[in-house]
């Protein structure tokens, strides 16, 4: 039997679909799952990146604000110290304020007004440094940066210093200092009021001084007087030399950097008339040495050049409690190294050491260089900070 041929106009029989083609055209379920999962991860990653970026911006602004706060706090701290020893630059009247007083003699040193009083209840001599007029100009610009050092002979260690007044020959001090001395002992004392020209990069120059034998003063009532400055006698103490170093403090990093630059006119320690100097740098806290650094040794010289930097970690909340002590020593290959002199800087040191420290804090991130006169090792110990 043969099948009937299809008649004209009748539809052709349908061919059943090929199952292999169906399998090739369909998308597997695991592919769809992978696509969905990948898309989700991509969206999540994008959102996470945006979130992290915003967080970093916020943290950056916060850290920047904290850094600004640290800088401002340290600057204010430095200004508070400067206010104790060194005011801002003042434009004071440079003409003599006393009628008819003119500085005609080019060798005239100037004059100083002071006051004296004795408090019998507390046993204290009160010395007032009021003002000076017509001081000698020791700077190249025709002016001076005067301050007054006050002490009672024979004790030179207990000194008081006024603030430094910038660029004036007629400073108004208005400061009072107290010396605790029994009244019966005052007759053998001599009051010395020495006027100096402050110089950051060299030794402070003596303008002149006033000496008042206390035996010649009637302290039954307050005394106020003008005295002409006299040429200061040469220091009796042996010169040990000078050292120049810079201080730099970065409050945001809590980093204190001391750069030992150079020394000059050091005391001769060797038989041949020279020395082999090096410098030890100590960081002290509470009067105790907590860190130590030292420079290289410079052979056969009294004017060594170092330019060596040392860094210490000092948190912002500890900067008032630390001091830095620099000791210049003479290296001895066979015997014991002998100290030539020391100098200390810090908030509790006073004098030039406090002045240098205050300038450093008032100018964070900037190195502040200054010359210091070396003191005998037994007299240069810093005062323990509170």
From Swiss-Prot:
Pro residues bias locations: 1-16
Membrane side Cytoplasmic: residue ranges: 46-386
Binding site for Ca(2+) 4: 270, 276, 330, 332
InterPro entries xref list: C2_dom, C2_domain_sf, Synaptotagmin
Residues reported in the UniProt entry to bind Ca(2+) 3: 199, 202, 205
Residues that bind Ca(2+) 2: 138-139, 197, 199, 205
Gene Ontology CC entries for this record: dense core granule; neuron projection; neuronal cell body; neuronal dense core vesicle membrane; perinuclear region of cytoplasm; plasma membrane; proximal neuron projection; recycling endosome membrane
Cofactor: Ca(2+)
Signal peptide: none
Cofactor comment: Binds 3 Ca(2+) ions per subunit. The ions are bound to the C2 domains.
Region (Disordered): 1-21
Domain C2: from-to ranges: 108-227, 239-372
Family matches, as PROSITE patterns: C2
GO biological process: regulation of calcium ion-dependent exocytosis
Membrane topology: Single-pass membrane protein
Vesicular-side positions: 1-24
Binding site for Ca(2+) 1: 139, 145, 197-199
Chain segments annotated as transmembrane: 25-45
Keywords of the record: Calcium, Cytoplasmic vesicle, Endosome, Membrane, Metal-binding, Repeat, Synapse, Transmembrane, Transmembrane helix
GO molecular function, one term: syntaxin binding
Entry keyword Thylakoid: no
Subcellular location per the Swiss-Prot or TrEMBL entry: Cytoplasmic vesicle, Secretory vesicle, Synaptic vesicle membrane; Recycling endosome membrane
Chain's role: May be involved in Ca(2+)-dependent exocytosis of secretory vesicles through Ca(2+) and phospholipid binding to the C2 domain or may serve as Ca(2+) sensors in the process of vesicular trafficking and exocytosis. Regulates the Ca(2+)-dependent secretion of norepinephrine in PC12 cells. Required for export from the endocytic recycling compartment to the cell surface.
UniProt family annotation: Belongs to the synaptotagmin family.
Subunit structure of this chain's protein: Homodimer. Interacts with both alpha- and beta-tubulin.
Name this protein carries in UniProt: Synaptotagmin-5
Species the sequence originates in: Mus musculus (Mouse)
